[in-house]
Amino acid sequence: MGSCISLQISCDQVLTRAYSCFFSLGNYIHKLKDNIVALEKAIEDLTATRDDVLRRVQMEEGKGLERLQQVQVWLKRVEIIRNQFYDLLSARNIEIQRLCFYSNCSTNLSSSYTYGQRVFLMIKEVENLNSNGFFEIVAAPAPKLEMRPIQPTIMGRETIFQRAWNRLMDDGVGTMGLYGMGGVGKTTLLTQIHNTLHDTKNGVDIVIWVVVSSDLQIHKIQEDIGEKLGFIGKEWNKKQESQKAVDILNCLSKKRFVLLLDDIWKKVDLTKIGIPSQTRENKCKVVFTTRSLDVCARMGVHDPMEVQCLSTNDAWELFQEKVGQISLGSHPDILELAKKVAGKCRGLPLALNVIGETMAGKRAVQEWHHAVDVLTSYAAEFSGMDDHILLILKYSYDNLNDKHVRSCFQYCALYPEDYSIKKYRLIDYWICEGFIDGNIGKERAVNQGYEILGTLVRACLLSEEGKNKLEVKMHDVVREMALWTLSDLGKNKERCIVQAGSGLRKVPKVEDWGAVRRLSLMNNGIEEISGSPECPELTTLFLQENKSLVHISGEFFRHMRKLVVLDLSENHQLDGLPEQISELVALRYLDLSHTNIEGLPACLQDLKTLIHLNLECMRRLGSIAGISKLSSLRTLGLRNSNIMLDVMSVKELHLLEHLEILTIDIVSTMVLEQMIDAGTLMNCMQEVSIRCLIYDQEQDTKLRLPTMDSLRSLTMWNCEISEIEIERLTWNTNPTSPCFFNLSQVIIHVCSSLKDLTWLLFAPNITYLMIEQLEQLQELISHAKATGVTEEEQQQLHKIIPFQKLQILHLSSLPELKSIYWISLSFPCLSGIYVERCPKLRKLPLDSKTGTVGKKFVLQYKETEWIESVEWKDEATKLHFLPSTKLVYILS
C-alpha cells in the first residue's frame, strides 16, 4: 500500500512539471509574433527616450557642464541593447516560417523555444531600461581638483614630503601608507601631496580625497567617491553597494586617478568600493594615513613611511611662530620658560600648535611659570589640553579592543617622562597584575606579553628603544593621555597618583588615600617613608630608584591588603624590611634587587600568594632560609647576590614545586652536581653564572651540562674545567635537536684549561658571544669533534649551521686560538666581530657572501699587525670586508 502511494505522488509530480514546462514552451512559441511586435514597440519607445536624454545632455554640455556618469552608463546600456535587438531581428523571418499549427508548434522546437525566450526576456530588459531613463539632472559642473586649506609648511617637514612625493611618483608604487601617532602631522602631509598634485597635475585625471575615520562604512566612501565622479540623484542613491562598485570601477578604469584616504583605522576593501588595481601600466595610486602599522600590513603596504615628531630645533621654531615674538620678548625670563613649555610637547605638532596658540597672548612671566607648573604636575588641566589634544590621542586608546591591552598600555604611564622601560619587566608586572593569565605557563605568558607590546608599538602608542629593541618608551603627551584615562578623564585624579621623577624628598600628601589604586613615586629622592595611609584599594606601588631611601616604617604597609605589586628595587641605601610586610596578603610581585638589605624577615614566608620574588644584586644578603615556604613562587631571581648556595639551600629550592624561572650563581661543584641531580631546577634556570669552580685533583674536570630548555644567559668565570659536554649527548649521538634552544648570551672569562667550545653547536640562537682569557683555547668549534664520527652521524651534523642568529662576537686574550670554524659561514645577523690579542687567529670563517646585504658590519681590532696578517679566503672577501675594519682601543 505504501508503495502505491509513493508511486501516485511521483506520477503527480512528473505530470505537474511536464505541464509547466509545456505551458512555458507553448507561450514562447505561440506568442512569438505578438512578442516581436511588442519588442519593436519597446525599442521605439526606448530610442525616443534616448534621443530626449541626448538632446538635454548636448544642451548642458554646450553650457560647459559635464554629463553625469550614471547618464553615460545608461546611454551605453541603451546602445548595447539596441545592437542586441537588431541581431535578434535578423533571424525573425526564419523563426516565423518555422511556426506551424496556427503558431502552436514549430518544425524546430528547440530553436523556436530559444528564440522566443530571448524575445520575451529582451522586452522586459528594454522596458526596465526605458523606465530608468528619466533623469532629474543629466549634467553637472566638471569636477575640479580644488586646493585644500593647509598651514604653511612646518619647519623640518620638507624632507619627509620630498621622500613621500618621490615614492608616490615611482611607477612601481601603487599603494602608499603614511603612519604615525595621533597629531604628528599625517593629514598635513597628505594635504601637501593633494595640493602639489593640484599645482603640477603630473598627468593625473582626477584626485579624490576621502576622510574615512574609525567608523568605516563602505557606502559612505562610495558616496564621497561617487559625488566626485558625478554619480548623483535618486537612482544612484537607491543602488546596492555592489552596483555602485561596478559604476565606480567602470568610470575609474578609464582614468589615471589618485585616491587619498585620510585616517583609516582598519583595512579598507578597495575592491568592494570599486577601486581598480593600481599597476605600473595605469600609474594609478592610493595613499592613506593611519596610526596603525597593522593597518598598513593589511592594506598590503609592507614598507610604510613613518611620520615622526619634530626635532627639538624644528619644534622650537614652530612654537615661536605660534606664540609670536611680542609675547616671547615681553619679559627677559619668558624665553627660557617658553623653551620649557615647548619641551613638554616633545616635538608633537598638535601639542605645539594648541599650547603655542594658548600662550600667544600671555605676556606676564607669572603666567608662563604657571604653564610650566601645570604641564609638569597634571597637564590635562592645561587650557585646551583635554578637548584638543588628549581627546584626539584617546582615539588610539579606544581602538584597543581588549580591556587587558588597554590596562597594559596605561601601566606604562607609571614611569617617569621619557623613560626607557625594559620589556621583560613590564611583562612580569602584567602577569602578576592579572592582565596576562600566568596559569598558562611562563613561556606562553611571556609570548603573550610580547604580542601586547607589539600591538602597542604598531598602534604608535609606544616606541621601541635600544639596539636590540629590548625596551619601550612612551611619548610624553601620550603618557598624559594615559594618565587622563586612568583618572576617568580627570574626574577622579587620586585614583592613580604618578609623581615619578618629580624630585620628591618625601611622600606627597593625598586628600583621599581610599581612592588610590596605583601609586608611583619611583625615581625620586625620598629618604624615609612613614605614616599609616588608609589604602584599601591600592594594588600597585612603585617605590624603586629612590637612591636615598633608608627606612620604611611598618605602619606604612598596614592598610594595603589589596596590594599586588611592590617594587623596591634600586633603593641602594635601604637596609631592611619591616615585619608588617607580612600583612600584604594579596602581594604577588616583590622586587628587592639592588638594595642593601642584609636579611629577609622571617614573616616574608607568610606571603602565600607571592609568585615573583627578585633578590638579584643584593650584595649583603646572606641567606634565603625559609624560601620554600613561599608555596606559590614561580619566578625567583638570585643572580649576583651574596648568597652562597649550600646543600640545604638547594633542597629548599627543590621544594618550590611551582617554580618556573630561576636566575642563580653557582660557585661550588657540589652544589652544581646537586642541582643537576635535581633535574627540575635545571629546567627552571633562565640566567646562570658559574664562578670559581675548583676541582680536587682526583676529580674529572669535565663540566657536564644538562639540557636547560629555559636558559637564556650563561656566564662562566674563573673555572678550572677542561671541557664542556652536554650531559645527555655525546658526539656520536644525533645532535640535530638543540639542547639550549633559548640560550642567547654566552660569556666565558678566565677558564684557562678549555681547548674548544664545540658544545655551542647545540645552542642555535646565540646572539652575543664573548670569550676572554682562555689561554689554551685553540678552536671555537673543534673540527675533529664535529667530524670524527660515522658517515651517517656526519650527515646529521651537516644539518647544523652554527651562529645563524649571532650578532656580536667578542674574542679577547686568546693566545692559542687558531680557528673559529673550519669553513665559511653565512652569519646572516652578524653586525660586529671584535678581536684583541689573538695573534694566531689568521683565518676568519668569512667569504664575500657572508652577512646580510645592506646590514652594517664592523670588524674591530686592536693591533694593526693582526689585521695585516689575516689570510682572507680570496680577493673578493678581502675587498668585501676591509672597508668595514676599524682600529680601536677595546676595553676588555
Swiss-Prot record:
Chain ranges of the NB-ARC domain: 137-440
SUPFAM superfamilies registered for this protein in UniProt: L domain-like, P-loop containing nucleoside triphosphate hydrolases
Keywords assigned: ATP-binding, Coiled coil, Leucine-rich repeat, Nucleotide-binding, Plant defense, Repeat
Positions of ATP binding: G180, M181, G182, G183, V184, G185, K186, T187
Pfam families, A to Z: LRR_14, NB-ARC, WH_DRP
Molecular function terms, GO-annotated: ADP binding; ATP binding
Coiled-coil parts of chain: 24-63
UniProt domain comment: The LRR repeats probably act as specificity determinant of pathogen recognition.
Function: Potential disease resistance protein.
Protein name: Putative disease resistance protein At4g10780
Organism listed in the record: Arabidopsis thaliana
